[in-house]
């Protein structure tokens, strides 16, 4: 399927996970404006990389394990206005992190990680790979962030609320700290089902927690959601 945003176009036909609201929210929320070197882990179609290119002047490196998704990501990058600042590498993030030139290299890392921790996988192997933590668990993801992030850098993630206890357990035993947390509600009168996270290597005293509601009880986007995504969605 193809998606047209205000400044770029995404073709995600060969990607395990299509363009999602989760990805758009993460790409719009992450503090990227000052970043010079950005790493997109598990890039898929390249949505987050392209959003990062629109929102910053930095260079973006995307890493994608699945071959067809990496090809789609490259295609979308080449078609964009920022092709000279975008690149994709087809490899496992753990192999990527073994390359010493990337140690402590990126001042922002962004990732919409796999989110099914267990249970039956999708019939389509590409979709299964994108959706299940079997291919990238939380501990290896945090290790990759620690290796590649600069001392003063940040990492932005979005996770299902139900995954937070296990994620925070892994975080506690890592060298990363939770700086900001946004509880995301799909509808105004529902409990939060997603969480936006900002991580850093430095423990900060101004930890922040807030909420984002995507739609009101009338089914329309909230003012907050419109303000967050208006630079991307065509109809806002």
Swiss-Prot record:
Classification via InterPro entries: DNA_methylase_N6_adenine_CS, SAM-dependent_MTases_sf, Small_mtfrase_dom, tRNA_Adenine-N(6)_MTase, tRNA_adenine-N6_MeTrfase
Disulfide bond annotation, renumbered to this chain: none
Molecular function via GO: nucleic acid binding; tRNA (adenine-N6)-methyltransferase activity
Keyword terms, alphabetized: Cytoplasm, Methyltransferase, S-adenosyl-L-methionine, Transferase, tRNA processing
EC numbers: 2.1.1.223
Entry-linked SUPFAM superfamilies: S-adenosyl-L-methionine-dependent methyltransferases
CDD domains in alphabetical order: AdoMet_MTases
Family to which this protein belongs: Belongs to the methyltransferase superfamily. tRNA (adenine-N(6)-)-methyltransferase family.
Protein name as it appears in the record: tRNA1(Val) (adenine(37)-N6)-methyltransferase
Species in which this protein is naturally found: Shewanella oneidensis (strain ATCC 700550 / JCM 31522 / CIP 106686 / LMG 19005 / NCIMB 14063 / MR-1)
């Amino acid at each position: 399927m193809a998606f047209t945003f205000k400044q770029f176009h995404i073709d995600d036909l060969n990607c395990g996970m299509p363009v999602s609201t989760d990805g758009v929210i993460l790409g719009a929320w992450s503090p990227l404006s000052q970043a010079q070197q950005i790493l997109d882990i598990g890039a898929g179609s390249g949505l987050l990389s392209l959003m990062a290119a629109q929102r910053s002047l930095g260079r973006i490196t995307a890493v994608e394990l699945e071959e067809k998704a990496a090809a789609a990501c490259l295609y979308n990058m080449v078609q964009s206005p920022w092709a000279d600042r975008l690149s994709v590498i087809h490899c496992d993030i753990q192999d990527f992190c073994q390359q010493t030139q990337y140690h402590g290299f990126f001042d922002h890392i962004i990732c919409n990680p796999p989110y099914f921790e267990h249970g039956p996988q999708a019939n389509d192997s590409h979709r299964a790979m994108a959706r299940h933590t079997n291919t990238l668990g939380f501990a290896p993801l945090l290790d990759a962030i620690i290796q590649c992030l600069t001392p003063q850098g940040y990492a932005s993630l979005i996770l299902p609320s139900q995954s937070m206890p296990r994620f925070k357990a892994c975080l506690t035993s890592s060298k990363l700290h939770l700086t900001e947390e946004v509880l995301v509600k799909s509808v105004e009168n529902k409990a939060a089902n997603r969480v936006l996270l900002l991580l850093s290597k430095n423990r900060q005293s101004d930890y922040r927690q807030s909420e984002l509601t995507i739609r009101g009880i009338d089914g329309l986007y909230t003012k907050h959601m419109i303000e967050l995504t208006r630079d991307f969605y065509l109809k806002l």
